[in-house]
């Protein structure tokens, strides 16, 4: 048997992350029936990585234990790893919903102001397929990495994505600078996905958002 866990914060403050991630992992880890499970798939986030100032991160990059929300997610990963064989999948920003936040923002005319922070993404269908791929590898007796960065092959500043979407949707953007937001600036390297034989349906956000717009 396998267990797939996709935790979410109960709220967006530190306590909400502690309850939604750390406490959830500790509760699961304490269950005696977990020993009958072959592998746990724990879906975390690339938020666990330390600020890279535009540099690259991969499965072995330093983790962020200074920010409370990220620290709660790191603690959750560690708790479930101690209890059972686990593959932690760390997705970048998951998209693909035709009514998703970025599309709605662009449709309202917001966005497009230049910025320097890189954005990392993975289409929701690719994330689901990756989870299935890991389970199939394990069933076949093949090696499954303990950690996987789930991101597509095109890290791009968010404002460029907004401008591309605006052109496709026929919308004029305000390009008014937004209030300063604390935004991580990193590029996620997901080369390990190819090494385990996984192929992205949407290798970049262009294919993914084009499909979402048509949906």
Segments and roles (model prediction):
Residues 1-41, 75:
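NAD(P)-cofactor binding segment of oxidoreductase domains
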Residues 18-22, 55-80, 96, 120-122, ...:
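Short-chain dehydrogenase/reductase
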Residues 27-68:
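Conserved Rossmann-fold NAD(P)-dependent oxidoreductase catalytic core, especially the SDR/UDP-sugar
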Residues 45, 77-97:
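Conserved beta-loop-beta element that borders a ligand/cofactor-binding pocket
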Residues 89, 127, 131, 150, ...:
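Non-catalytic, hydrophobic alpha-helical segments
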Residues 94, 101-104, 113-135:
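Substrate-positioning beta->alpha
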Residues 128-133, 137-184:
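Mid/C-terminal beta-alpha module of Rossmann-like enzyme folds, strongest
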Residues 136, 180-215:
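C-terminal amphipathic/interface module of NAD(P)-dependent oxidoreductases
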């Amino acid at each position: 048997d396998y267990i797939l866990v996709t935790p979410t914060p109960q709220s967006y403050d530190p306590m909400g992350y502690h309850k939604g991630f750390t406490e959830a992992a500790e509760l699961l880890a304490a269950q005696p029936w977990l020993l009958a499970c072959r592998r746990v798939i724990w879906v975390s986030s690339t938020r666990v990585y330390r600020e890279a100032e535009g540099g690259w991160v991969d499965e072995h990059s330093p983790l962020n234990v200074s920010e409370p929300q990220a620290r709660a997610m790191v603690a959750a990963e560690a708790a479930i790893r101690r209890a059972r064989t686990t593959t932690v999948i760390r997705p970048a920003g998951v998209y693909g919903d035709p009514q998703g936040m970025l599309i709605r923002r662009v449709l309202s005319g917001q966005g497009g102001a230049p910025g320097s922070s890189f954005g990392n993404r993975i289409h929701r269908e690719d994330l689901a397929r990756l989870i299935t791929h890991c389970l199939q590898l394990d069933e076949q007796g093949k090696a499954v990495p303990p950690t996987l960065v789930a991101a597509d092959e095109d890290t791009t500043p968010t404002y460029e994505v907004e401008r591309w979407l605006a052109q496709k949707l026929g919308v004029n953007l305000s390009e008014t600078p937004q209030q300063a937001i604390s935004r991580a600036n990193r590029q996620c390297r997901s080369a390990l996905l190819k090494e385990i034989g996984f192929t992205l349906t949407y290798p970049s956000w262009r294919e993914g958002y084009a499909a979402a717009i048509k949906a």
